[in-house]
Curated annotation (Swiss-Prot):
Listed transmembrane segments: none
Binding site residues for ATP: 15-23, 38
Post-translational events: Autophosphorylated on serine residues.
UniProt source species: Myxococcus xanthus
Protein name: Serine/threonine-protein kinase pkn5
Amino acid sequence: MPLKVIGPYRVLETLGSGGAGTVYRALDRRTTDEVALKLLSAGPARDARAARRLAREFDTLVDLSHPNVVKVFESGVHQGVPYLAMELIEGLTLRHYLDLSSGDRQTPPGSHTPRSPLSVLRTADDDFGPLSRSFSDSMDDSEDSPFDGTFGLEAFAEEAPSEDLESFASSASPHVGIGSDDSLEGFDLPPPMPRPAEPEEEPGRVVREEDLNRPERMGRLKDAMLQICEALAYIHGHGLVHRDLKPSNIMVDDDRQVRLMDFGLAKFLADDAAITEAGKLVGTYRYMAPEQILGEPLDGRADLYSLGVILYELLSGRPPFDAKTPHELWRQVLETEPPPVLALNLHGDPQLARVAHRLIRKEPDDRFQTAEEVYEALSE
């Protein structure tokens, strides 16, 4: 009989698939609640060290409970393959939420208005790490398109990595694996959703200052940043570093509550040396702190750097560095200074700009040292 059950969960459909595994919509047969079920692929699961590390990580994630952090329900192993069950989230990405005009309406609390065909359903893990997608995908995380910020089932499909990225990773470390096609032998589960054609981008599209500086947008931005600081203060207080903080991992639900997601890359601080050895990198390129690029031990200040890149982008309308290749991007992050936010957005908020620039300083000791400090600076 075809196997469509993983532990206590009945698989309903595939939400997305990548080199490290697949995310399913599943039903908890004990409670009848729907969850997002992340199932590791067979290849990584055969790596004993990776499996042990994931087991430790999963145990920690289950213990997290904070209103601004997506809830992980439980972890387990099915036929030797680790899985992670987490809540399904409905809402908008941070970028799309900020782009709502005063005439737009996010679904209010308690509303059950039917969704459009392009659902905004989003789970806690649509990105299985930096090496499972093409470099252009990672670099284009903030590029606008007609679909930007809204996530349907197609948002979980992933492209194969580019040749440039494969050759770069191969030269960087023989231990870095890319785009594995390992599947779960013996599993008769829904196949991954095919990736739809990408919508054409508007040529020469420029973000206008008046759009960036709309009072309602700036109010939402500041409130969202404060909530993110609360989430980071919580996870850092539990000895964790997110390591992959980026706009698509920050959702705003129907109650305007920010939800920090995708802790698939979160690690114990105590395991730092083992995780970064042999050139193994986790995170999305544009948002990586210099010390993360260099493979050095990380603490919460690496997440604060990523937060600074996000804030810089949302204030200026562009990323701090505009390289087209990994080599050039990492050189810029390590060696060059980005243009001042207020040179790109003349009427931007000076206080938020100061916070962004301090967060993205190259030396961790020169940044804010804790999320609580960032919260206080944003509140001034």
